[in-house]
A protein has these predicted regions:
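Short catalytic micro-motifs in class I SAM-dependent methyltransferases
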Residues: 104-108
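S-adenosyl-L-methionine-dependent methyltransferase catalytic module, highlighting the catalytic core
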Residues: 50, 110-118, 128-248
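C-terminal beta-strand of the catalytic ATP-binding
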Residues: 250-253
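Conserved N-terminal segment of class I S-adenosyl-L-methionine
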Residues: 1-90, 99-103, 116, 197, ...
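Helix-loop segment at the mouth of the active site in Rossmann-fold oxidoreductases
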Residues: 90-92, 109
Length: 253
């Protein structure tokens, strides 16, 4: 059974997602809004539908897909254009959407490289792609809620891994793959215990660019914060080593 299949009938996870505060997904949802009124937008891994609902309320033709039946059952109450999918091939034709995004999904998928390729495939030329995930290669920061992020030893290991990834991208780009992790099984559940991919901004950018995108923004802040703080955090390349990985790209024409 694939890791994604564990979410198929997970009612408890649907209840967990239903408790998200709107501030958690506001930046992602606002960035996902297409530039043209009424344009089509897709939220991949839509959960219980909060982002889809926000887009629909703003006048866009919002769609959502998820691998979880309990999630989709709830999401359809927000928007009937939410549907179950297999977690691999998106059930839409090529170049179908003005904007496509995935919030905290990439770290949970079995084939992250193929997942990014699918996001790009269903985005029209000139369209927007928004991908946001935890940065498991943190070197700086706080609120290190996952063991991969904690402690000086892990942060040093993350620094060295980032340097190795950079060399690999230069010398053998066709061999680059996201690192995999073993999910953590414990009670109580904490966010991303179930993550199986060591997502990070460096590789997310790499695979977006390899699939024909221009990356417009790489930020370590996945939520709205005060503008001076946001500017300072995202000014330097250290943003690749902090907090989260929030990327905005355009599919090349």
């Amino acid at each position: 059974m694939s890791h994604q299949e564990t979410y198929r009938h997970n009612e408890a996870y649907a209840q967990f997602l239903a408790g998200w505060d709107a501030a958690f997904y506001a930046k992602y949802a606002d960035t996902l809004k297409p530039n043209e009124p009424g344009a089509r937008a897709l939220d991949v891994g839509c959960g219980v539908g909060q982002v889809v609902a926000r887009l629909a309320e703003a006048g866009f033709e919002a769609h959502g897909v998820d691998v979880s039946e309990p999630n989709i059952e709830r999401a359809k109450k927000f928007c009937p254009r939410c549907q179950l999918y297999d977690g691999r091939r998106l059930p839409f034709p090529d170049a179908h959407f003005a904007s496509v995004g995935a919030l905290n999904v990439l770290e949970h998928v079995d084939e992250p490289e193929a997942f990014i390729k699918e996001l790009v495939r269903v985005t029209r030329l000139g369209g927007r792609i928004v991908v946001s995930s935890p940065n498991f290669f943190r070197v700086f920061g706080f609120r290190d809620y996952h063991p991969r992020m904690r402690g000086v030893a892990n942060k040093w290991r993350n620094w060295r891994r980032l340097q190795a990834k950079r060399r690999q991208m230069r010398e053998s780009p066709e061999s680059v793959r996201f690192d995999k992790m073993t999910p953590i099984v414990k009670e109580p559940f904490t966010p991303d215990d179930d993550a199986i991919v060591a997502t990070n901004a460096l590789e997310m950018r790499f695979f977006l660019e390899r699939n024909g995108c221009t990356v417009e923004r790489v930020e370590c802040t996945d939520r709205y914060v005060a503008k001076p703080i946001d500017f300072a955090l995202n000014l330097l390349p250290t943003r690749y080593m902090m907090f989260n990985a929030f990327l905005v790209a355009t599919r090349k024409v």
